[in-house]
Amino acid sequence: MNLAARALIRAIDVINRKGKSAGVRLVRLTGKRPYAIHPKHLVDHPWHDWYVPHLQANDFVLDVGCANGAHLVRAATRCRAIVGFDYDLAQLPIAARTIREQALGNARVFAWDITGAFPFPDRCFSAALFLDVIEHLHPRVAVLREIARVLRDDGRLLVSGPNRATRWRRRLEAAGLFSYSDPDHKIEYTREEFLAELAAGGFEPVGEVEPVVLDTPWAGAIDAVGGLSLGLYDRLSRWKRDAALRRPQDSTGFRVVARKRR
């Protein structure tokens, strides 16, 4: 790769990374929400809440690493009860406030280090959400085993993680640049690596591994657009989703419904 190509990729990467954080801030600055949140949480896309159809009305659900509660409050409308915990003390108050505002009597959150032992007895949950969290952790297998411990034998794990092998990630790597999609990520995966990590933690997939949206170098610009116009963001997000269905190898990540290994 010549110097000009490397410089172009670097410039696009800078725009991509800054655009995501700009979109989050613009949501608050433009009054779409009184707090900073990613615009993807403000549009109604069925693939965003992909886990909801896998929940049942009588489920007791655990949300591991619930952060601002965006997924938790959505799941609460589907299940009997849900508990979320996280050690992000900046995000948890947002989750608690949303629970109060929406009068979700079946949901609660609390602060806890999710990398340690969970404060729950064995086999007490029928489903667990572990969404875009595993890549931020170091003791990943230990956390998966804790999830397996607190899940019933017939319980379901709804888990997602990032794809490191997309065409854009490979271009960044070839240019000698940091290729992970988030600077806080401790790991990203190929499809096979992700399934191997789940297996090491005691889980096996039920059905196919599902894509998310296209990993495009212009994702950050699209996120920034979302901070300004949710209508345009909606259309661009649908394009990314359709592209990922056509090219699952270039999806931003993987989504898996898993069960405890037998």
Per-range role (PLM):
Residues A90, H138-A142, R169:
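Short N-terminal helix/helix-N-cap motif within the alpha/beta-hydrolase-1
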Residues V141-D153:
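A short glycine-rich, Lys/Arg-flanked "PGG" loop and its adjoining helix->strand segment in the class I
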Residues N163-H185:
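Short, glycine-/aromatic-enriched active-site segment of Class I SAM-dependent methyltransferases
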Residues W239-R247:
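Short, P/G- and charge-enriched loop/turn segments at secondary-structure junctions
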Residues K186-G201:
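Short alpha-helix
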Residues M1-P121, A127-L131, L144, V209-V213, ...:
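Conserved N-terminal segment of class I S-adenosyl-L-methionine
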Residues D132-H136:
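A short His-aromatic
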Residues G155-G161:
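Conserved beta-strand signature within the Rossmann-like core of class I S-adenosyl-L-methionine
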